[in-house]
Amino acid sequence: MTGIQALERIAPTKPMQPGQVERREFEYERHGTLSLIANFDVVSGQVVSPSLGPTRTEADFAVHIGRTIDLDPEGVWLFVVDQLNTHQSETLVRLVAERCGLAVELGEKGKSGVLRSMATRAAFLSDPTHRIQFVYLPKHTSWLNQVEMWFGILVRRVLKRGNFPSLEALHARILEFIEYFNKTAKPFRWTYTGRPLVS
């Protein structure tokens, strides 16, 4: 989940010429932001069920997860997420309980039961007996989350040198890139061998 600004350069970019580097205006006009919530399928290397919208609230994340689960309503789902509070929300707990057909008393947020705290909600969401399970990465390990690597690719290939005169242009360009990326997608291959680092 990430926020993306629709930035339009004030002056047009001047392309490279012999003996001259490309010249890009550093001043820009901001046309608003979009929030991208995406899933990265580690087996196929594809971006699955992306959601683009103006906000990234707990309701937005729960709707996104619901749409993703709708791709295979009876399937087993494993979501790797960071420690963000929207990934441990009451709305998400209620969605998982409903979709898994769990008839348990969830309690009241901030007071009792599963909904009492973020820790109790995270424990419920990460229960391996549920067919929809969340795995929470430890803090400061975003490099383990493969969707974060994909966000880096999106920044380098689309956003860094992009010029977006409107939110609609940004929205369309991101979806075009995802479609293009998925056509040639391959899973990321880890190259670190696991040897201890030496100083």
How would you describe each model-predicted region?
Residues 1-66, 195-198:
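Extended, low-complexity cationic-aromatic segments
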Residues 5-7, 86-90, 143-146, 197-199:
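Short catalytic/ligand-binding loop motif for oxyanion handling, primarily in non-cytosolic enzymes
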Residues 11-14, 93-97:
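Short secondary-structure boundary/capping segments
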Residues 23-28, 99-146, 163-164:
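RNase H-like polynucleotidyl transferase catalytic core
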Residues 67-71:
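A generic secondary-structure signal
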Residues 75-87, 110-112:
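Acidic/histidine-rich, metal-coordinating catalytic segments
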Residues 130-136, 140-141, 148-199:
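C-terminal anion-handling pockets and recognition modules
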